[in-house]
């Protein structure tokens, strides 16, 4: 059984990481969200970053969006391939939790396979994290 928290090493935190993922990664659209997905250099490591602008709504609406995206990622991250994901809302409507779970399981593997199966090298420059390691968590 896995922990029911999302550790700090499973999050995208720095601006340069967000920029790398958006430039080097592939983009796919779910039913309510937009995913930017880039392969991870560390096997068994899946990271999540969330961006929500003020145009989406007031703070309570933005925080609700972030909470349900984090929870959907937490539930599905052990079944996802090694990747780095940035999630953005597609429109101003609150996404449904079930749709997010479905998007995480279907859209992200498709995005990784479509862009990176032909060309294994990263596109848009190299991101070299300093002292950043991601270990797969033990059950």
Swiss-Prot record:
Keyword Membrane recorded: no
Signal peptide bounds: none
Enzyme Commission number(s) of this protein: 3.1.26.5
This protein's record includes keyword Hydrolase: yes
Annotated segments matching region Disordered: 116-139
Keyword list, A-Z: Endonuclease, Hydrolase, Nuclease, RNA-binding, tRNA processing
Catalyses which reaction(s): Endonucleolytic cleavage of RNA, removing 5'-extranucleotides from tRNA precursor
Pfam families referenced in this protein's UniProt entry, alphabetically: Ribonuclease_P (PF00825)
Class of enzymatic activity (EC top level): hydrolase
Single annotated GO MF: 3'-tRNA processing endoribonuclease activity
SUPFAM superfamilies: Ribosomal protein S5 domain 2-like
Gene Ontology CC annotations of this record: ribonuclease P complex
Domain of life where this protein originates: Bacteria
InterPro entries: Ribosomal_Su5_D2-typ_SF (IPR020568), Ribsml_uS5_D2-typ_fold_subgr (IPR014721), RNase_P (IPR000100), RNase_P_CS (IPR020539)
BP GO terms, sorted: tRNA 5'-leader removal
Function: RNaseP catalyzes the removal of the 5'-leader sequence from pre-tRNA to produce the mature 5'-terminus. It can also cleave other RNA substrates such as 4.5S RNA. The protein component plays an auxiliary but essential role in vivo by binding to the 5'-leader sequence and broadening the substrate specificity of the ribozyme.
NCBIfam families per record: rnpA (TIGR00188)
Subunit structure: Consists of a catalytic RNA component (M1 or rnpB) and a protein subunit.
Protein name in UniProt: Ribonuclease P protein component
The species this protein was found in: Chlamydia abortus (strain DSM 27085 / S26/3)
Upper taxonomic lineage: Bacteria, Pseudomonadati, Chlamydiota, Chlamydiia, Chlamydiales
Name of the encoding gene: rnpA
């Amino acid at each position: 059984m896995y922990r029911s928290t999302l550790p700090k090493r499973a999050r995208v935190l720095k601006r340069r990481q967000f920029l790398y993922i958006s430039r080097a990664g592939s983009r796919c659209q779910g039913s309510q969200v937009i995913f930017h997905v880039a392969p991870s250099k560390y096997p068994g490591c899946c990271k999540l970053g969330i961006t929500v602008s003020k145009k989406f709504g007031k703070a309570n609406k933005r925080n609700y969006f972030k909470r349900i995206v984090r929870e959907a990622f937490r539930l599905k991250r052990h079944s996802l391939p090694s990747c780095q994901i940035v999630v953005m809302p597609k429109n101003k409507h609150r996404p449904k939790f079930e749709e997010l779970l479905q998007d995480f399981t279907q859209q992200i593997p498709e995005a990784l396979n479509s862009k990176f199966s032909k060309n294994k090298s990263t596109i848009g420059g190299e991101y070299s994290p300093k002292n950043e390691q991601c270990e797969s968590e033990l059950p």
